[in-house]
């Protein structure tokens, strides 16, 4: 039995389209670095797009191992962790500055508050931070004033 030429063409075209759509394509093996260099001049950016030479990419599909294959990640936390928390906020120094303003208080500020809120706890030679703030004792002067005394 003879198959018409038109049917063969349609069959071949359908085969090529189906087979071609299932192929994902070959990944790119060549790459090029690109960057933008700008020299601002007043209100203008004066940018130039530059391209580096092309180079071959290495095949990284074989370099990817199973999850958690890295022995450093599997060890867990280090046993010889040294905390610099004891040195935090201590020391001496000098400085200069200028400004104007007025205020009152005992001098406790941001660093003192941080030391109250983040107290280290030592469990089996590993330093963890307890992020639950302690109850603060507000014994400083002018801390417990009612809102009626505020001047807006």
Swiss-Prot record:
Positions of the propeptide segment: 26-74
**InterPro entries linked:** Serglycin
Q: According to its UniProt record, how is this protein modified after translation?
A: O-glycosylated; contains chondroitin sulfate and heparan sulfate.
Location of the region described as 10 X 2 AA tandem repeats of G-S in the Swiss-Prot/TrEMBL record: 89-108
This entry's comment on induction and repression of expression is: By phorbol myristate acetate in T-lymphocytes. This induction is not inhibited by cyclosporine.
**GO cellular component, as recorded:** cytolytic granule; extracellular space; Golgi apparatus; mast cell granule
Segments crossing the lipid bilayer? none
- GO annotation, biological process: apoptotic process; biomineral tissue development; granzyme-mediated programmed cell death signaling pathway; maintenance of granzyme B location in T cell secretory granule; maintenance of protease location in mast cell secretory granule; mast cell secretory granule organization; negative regulation of bone mineralization; negative regulation of cytokine production
Region Disordered, residue ranges: 66-115
Q: What happens when the gene is disrupted?
A: Mice develop normally and are fertile but display mast cell granule and T-lymphocyte secretory granule defects. Granules are more amorphous than in the wild-type and show a less defined dense core formation. There is a lack of mast cell-specific protease activity although mRNAs for a variety of proteases are detected and storage of granzyme B is affected in T-lymphocytes. Neutrophil granules display a lack of neutrophil elastase and processing of MMP2 is abrogated. Macrophages show no major morphological defects.
Q: Gly residues compositional bias: what residue ranges?
A: 90-110
What UniProt keywords are attached to this protein's entry?
Answer: Apoptosis, Biomineralization, Disulfide bond, Glycoprotein, Golgi apparatus, Lysosome, Proteoglycan, Repeat, Secreted, Signal
Known function: Plays a role in formation of mast cell secretory granules and mediates storage of various compounds in secretory vesicles. Required for storage of some proteases in both connective tissue and mucosal mast cells and for storage of granzyme B in T-lymphocytes. Plays a role in localizing neutrophil elastase in azurophil granules of neutrophils. Mediates processing of MMP2. Plays a role in cytotoxic cell granule-mediated apoptosis by forming a complex with granzyme B which is delivered to cells by perforin to induce apoptosis.
Subunit structure and binding partners: Binds to activated CD44 and to GZMB.
What is the name of this protein?
Serglycin
From which organism does this entry originate? Mus musculus (Mouse)
